[in-house]
């Protein structure tokens, strides 16, 4: 990405292209993400009583006498990428989907039951909030990747073969670090049913209770899922793309080739990192439940301990819960995202050739 090249792409143009890709991808893929997390949030048996908050996906709680002693439930009510939590006192707030609880036997069954009991709009619930988070995060991530890859190759710090893997891992780690506090704060806001205007107060309360490090409590499992995913994805994407391109130059990559390469790479990376996705869902669930019950947060279990616990309780299948919807989502979402991004870059490339940068 040479800024002196009239046909080059500026970082701002990269951000616009990736932001547009995030919007298109979210519109198409949010329903599959809803189903994926709903399946992951199920346990073999439903816990009816609260014991250790970090052990359950679905937690019962009872309000104190000062709050009318109304029993309720803290459920992971997924709304796409953000996977928020909702509090359900007496089932009144959660309406139909809480009063008529269902268990899903598979991906298709989940789609049918969600639409039947909660309505079609539920598959896209929370999309605006999803876009608020994903658009800037994706813009930062993809722009950082391209800039880092160009730097690594330009400075000969690593071979062209492994530059995408290193750049992808570094870009994702930086993005996760920036976004992780925002995701945790959003979970607290959802659990407490307060408005976004009270965001500052929510942050202050979290910092006062657990220090600044508390804002990154979900960083570990998120990084363990997203950083390897990113490294594997970009390595395979560039490799598959070069194979499909053949002797042609990289700049001549078509949208179709980007779509196929992105889909294959996303499917491989999603399969290998699925156990960490399950852990991330469970940890987010437990953190939200603790916040909802206004109790002192327990000691946070390590990612590896959670992996062993899930395997002990649910077997190896538990580590790959939501496999089908994650794969079904990962392949097309990665394909749509990267092809839209490449199309956007091609558009700006042609635009810059016709009207050189700086004029």
Curated annotation (Swiss-Prot):
Q: Where are the bilayer-spanning segments?
A: 15-35, 122-142, 165-185, 215-235, 256-276, 318-338
Q: Where are the Solcar repeats?
A: 9-151, 159-243, 253-347
Topology within the bilayer: Multi-pass membrane protein
What's the superkingdom here?
Answer: Eukaryota
Where along this sequence does the record place binding of [2Fe-2S] cluster? 74, 78, 88, 94
Chief place where the protein resides: mitochondrion
Presence of keyword Repeat: yes
Q: Which InterPro entries match?
A: Mitochondrial_sb/sol_carrier, Mt_carrier_dom_sf, Mtm1-like
Q: Which residues lie on this side of the membrane: Mitochondrial matrix?
A: 36-121, 186-214, 277-317
UniProt similarity note? Belongs to the mitochondrial carrier (TC 2.A.29) family.
Which reactions fall under this protein's catalytic activity? glutathione(in) = glutathione(out)
One GO biological process this protein is involved in is: glutathione import into mitochondrion
Which residue stretches are annotated as topological domain Mitochondrial intermembrane? 1-14, 143-164, 236-255, 339-359
Q: Which UniProt keywords apply?
A: 2Fe-2S, Heme biosynthesis, Iron, Iron-sulfur, Membrane, Metal-binding, Mitochondrion, Mitochondrion inner membrane, Repeat, Transmembrane, Transmembrane helix, Transport
Q: Name one GO cellular component term.
A: mitochondrial inner membrane
By what name is this protein known? Mitochondrial glutathione transporter SLC25A39
Q: What does this protein do?
A: Mitochondrial transporter required for glutathione import into mitochondria. Glutathione, which plays key roles in oxidative metabolism, is produced exclusively in the cytosol and is imported in many organelles. Mitochondrial glutathione is required for the activity and stability of proteins containing iron-sulfur clusters, as well as erythropoiesis.
**What organism, scientifically named, is this protein from?**
Rattus norvegicus (Rat)
Compartments annotated for it: namely:
Mitochondrion inner membrane
Activity regulation statement = The activity of SLC25A39 is regulated by levels of mitochondrial glutathione via its ability to bind [2Fe-2S] iron-sulfur cluster. Upon physiological levels of mitochondrial glutathione, glutathione prevents iron-sulfur-binding to SLC25A39 promoting cleavage and degradation by AFG3L2. Upon depletion of mitochondrial glutathione, SLC25A39 binds iron-sulfur, preventing cleavage and degradation by AFG3L2.
Q: Transport among the record's keywords? A: yes
After translation, the protein is modified as follows:
Cleaved and degraded by AFG3L2; degradation by AFG3L2 is regulated by the ability of SLC25A39 to bind iron-sulfur. In absence of mitochondrial glutathione, SLC25A39 binds iron-sulfur, preventing cleavage and degradation by AFG3L2. The presence of mitochondrial glutathione prevents iron-sulfur-binding to SLC25A39, promoting cleavage and degradation by AFG3L2.
Could you state a single Gene Ontology molecular function term? Answer: 2 iron, 2 sulfur cluster binding
